[in-house]
From Swiss-Prot:
UniProt topology in membrane: Multi-pass membrane protein
Species: Mycobacterium tuberculosis (strain ATCC 25618 / H37Rv)
Keyword Transmembrane helix attributed: yes
UniProt name for this protein: Putative zinc metalloprotease Rip2
Parts of the chain that traverse the membrane: 14-34, 39-59, 97-117, 128-148, 156-176, 211-231
Domain of life of the organism encoding this protein: Bacteria
The encoding gene: rip2
Disulfide bond annotation, renumbered to this chain: none
GO CC entries: plasma membrane
Active site: E61
Length: 259
């Protein structure tokens, strides 16, 4: 690969930069809405949350890819995983469309995108770190957004901060979901290197049913209550009221008022 090609394989893609810009535009609209619930407020929070969530999906997968690259899998650069281009991360519908649908229907940050990294030559500890890198990004984003809300919240711009709080809430749902030891998710991938080879082979077919397991989690009242109990507990540790995130959810999912 030429030097120019190498630079392009790690340079942030125009699409990712466009998503960042769109997030900023949504934030600006929410800021201009002030504290008044009006069409501008719904539009601003919707754009900020959806674009911001896509940005976080790219950063999550970049976390996996960059960690793998640091540990020796330099093919991730060739595959474009270090460009933060959402088109590089698996199937567009399953990786991007499905998470958007889950946000629209239930306000849940579903992990969707995926990068394929080579970890077979890595130590057990490094394989685990590669798997945990993505959820770590979600945790860092949640902490950053909640810290900003806690320190900078101004009732005059309540619409903006409601959207920021909801985006942080989505990061925490993604964190908890990803850490579940369900085959196909990061939590299981972090544990898999520590399992016996025969156990790994026995559980491998279950990875294709990860979405089914998640649907059971969301539809079973007891499991659903446990899941959101953990998410709300983590959210409340920040000192930010989860009612602010609930308000942001209503603004981002404005159709839920009527349906």
């Amino acid at each position: 690969m030429s030097e120019t090609g190498q630079r392009e394989s790690v340079r942030p893609s125009p699409i990712f930069l466009g998503l960042l810009g769109l997030t900023a535009v949504g934030g600006a609209l929410a800021w201009l809405a002030g504290e008044t619930v009006q069409p501008l407020a719904y539009a601003g929070v919707f754009v900020m949350v959806i674009a911001g969530w896509l940005v976080s999906l790219c950063l999550h997968e970049f976390g996996h890819a960059f960690t793998a690259w640091r540990f020796g899998d330099h093919d991730v650069a060739v595959r474009g995983y270090l460009t933060l281009d959402p088109r590089r991360y698996s199937h567009p519908m399953l990786s991007l469309g499905l998470p958007m649908l889950f946000i629209a229907l239930g306000g849940i940050g579903l992990p969707g995108a995926a990068v394929y990294v080579h970890t077979w030559f890595m130590t057990t500890a490094r394989r685990t770190l590669v798997s945990l890198a993505g959820p770590t990004v979600n945790l860092a984003l949640a902490m950053l957004l909640l810290a900003a809300t806690r320190l900078l919240f101004d009732p005059i711009h309540a619409v903006l901060w409601a959207g920021v709080a909801f985006l942080a809430f989505l990061q925490l749902t993604a964190l908890v979901l990803n850490l579940l030891p369900i085959p196909g998710l990061d939590g299981y991938a972090a544990l898999e290197p520590h399992l016996r080879p025969e156990t790994q082979r026995a559980l491998a077919p279950a990875k294709q049913f990860a979405l089914v397991f998640l649907l059971v989690l969301f539809l079973a009242p007891t499991l659903n209550g446990w899941f959101f109990g953990v998410v709300y507990w983590l959210f409340d540790l920040s000192g930010v009221s989860h009612r602010l995130a609930a308000a942001g959810s209503v603004l981002a999912r404005f159709w839920s008022i009527w349906f």
